[in-house]
Amino acid sequence: MLILTRRVGETLIIGDNISITVLGVKGNQVRIGVNAPKEISVHREEIYQRIQTEKKTQTQ
C-alpha cells in the first residue's frame, strides 16, 4: 500500500484521468473530492461490498 500525506486543498492524481482532492478535515473525518470519468465507478467501501453481495445473491 502506498501511503501519502496531503494537506487540505492538495490533490492526488491516479493515472491520466482521476484526481482526488482533500477538501477538509474535521476531527477524525476527512472530506475528499473525486474527479473521474463517468465510466469509472467510485464507491465508499461499505457500499461497494453491498453491491458485490447483491450481485452474488442474484447469480445464485
Curated annotation (Swiss-Prot):
GO terms, molecular function: mRNA 5'-UTR binding
Pfam families in UniProt: CsrA
Keywords on record: Activator, Cytoplasm, Repressor, RNA-binding, Translation regulation
Keyword rRNA-binding: no
Membrane-crossing residue ranges in chain numbering: none
GO biological process: mRNA catabolic process; negative regulation of translational initiation; positive regulation of translational initiation; regulation of carbohydrate metabolic process
UniProt-annotated location(s): Cytoplasm
GO cellular component: a single term: cytosol
UniProt keyword Chloroplast, yes or no: no
InterPro entries: CsrA, CsrA_sf
UniProt cross-references to NCBIfam families, sorted A to Z: csrA, PRK01712.1
Family recorded in the similarity comment: Belongs to the CsrA/RsmA family.
Known partners and oligomeric status: Homodimer; the beta-strands of each monomer intercalate to form a hydrophobic core, while the alpha-helices form wings that extend away from the core.
Role this protein plays: A key translational regulator that binds mRNA to regulate translation initiation and/or mRNA stability. Mediates global changes in gene expression, shifting from rapid growth to stress survival by linking envelope stress, the stringent response and the catabolite repression systems. Usually binds in the 5'-UTR; binding at or near the Shine-Dalgarno sequence prevents ribosome-binding, repressing translation, binding elsewhere in the 5'-UTR can activate translation and/or stabilize the mRNA. Its function is antagonized by small RNA(s).
Record PANTHER family: CARBON STORAGE REGULATOR (PTHR34984:SF1)
Protein name per its UniProtKB record: Translational regulator CsrA
Lineage, highest ranks first: Bacteria, Pseudomonadati, Pseudomonadota, Gammaproteobacteria, Enterobacterales
